[in-house]
Design a protein with these regions (language model features):
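RNA substrate-binding interface of SAM-dependent RNA methyltransferases
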Residues: 1-101, 165
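Short amphipathic alpha-helical segments
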Residues: 23-24, 50, 109-111, 131-134
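Short, glycine/polar-rich helix-capping loops at beta-to-alpha or helix-loop-helix junctions
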Residues: 61-66, 126-132
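Short acidic active-site motifs
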Residues: 84-85, 107-109, 128
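A contiguous loop/helix-start segment that scaffolds small-molecule binding in enzyme catalytic cores
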Residues: 116-117
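Structured adenosyl-cofactor binding patch, chiefly the S-adenosyl-L-methionine
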Residues: 130-168
Length: 168
């Protein structure tokens, strides 16, 4: 990895698939992401204490996430939130970057990551809601050469995190 290593928090908002969540945890652990915030209806691993979900549901989701996370869900600190805590992160000095295709998005290879960055990922089909896009300090996009208009959210997260952490 490069000498410069920004502090990155991933916000996984309204991601439906436990397999995508697990893959994001595994990639985040491998690249040294500080923590993950699972917001909206994003499934998350069992909490160590006071998990508000029914025990059988928490166990089921944790097992499903573990299939792709392979233990990374136990190593990467995470929190849950009904909405992405953008104001609190900004107050802590984080720049909020949404990973989204948008005419105002900066191509990821042209973006210089600040020392503290919160990377917002949106749902698999619709991406980041327009209101949340507006709330971001910057939108980033992964340039595409193919005819499809998007990558899988966990794949996009991996490409973006690698670029931000290793090639910045």
């Amino acid at each position: 990895m490069s000498v410069r290593h920004p502090s990155i928090i991933v916000i996984a908002h309204n991601i439906r698939s436990t397999h995508n969540v697990g893959a994001i945890f595994r990639t985040a652990e491998g690249l040294g992401v500080e923590r993950i915030i699972c917001s909206g209806y994003t499934p998350y691993p069992a909490l160590s204490a006071n998990d508000p979900r029914l025990p059988h549901l928490a166990e089921k989701l944790t097992r499903q996430i573990h299939k792709t996370a392979l233990g990374a869900e136990e190593l990467v600190p995470f929190a849950t939130s009904t909405e992405p805590p953008l104001a609190a992160l900004r107050q802590d000095g984080y720049v909020i970057a949404g990973l989204e295709q948008n005419p105002r998005a900066v191509p990821l290879p042209h973006y210089q990551a600040p020392p503290k960055l919160a990377l917002l990922l949106g749902e698999e089909v619709a991406g980041i809601a327009p209101g949340l896009q507006t709330a971001c300090d910057v939108l980033l996009e992964i340039p595409m050469a193919g005819r499809k208009e998007s990558f899988n959210v966990s794949v996009a997260a991996g490409m973006a995190l690698y670029q931000l952490l290793c090639h910045n």
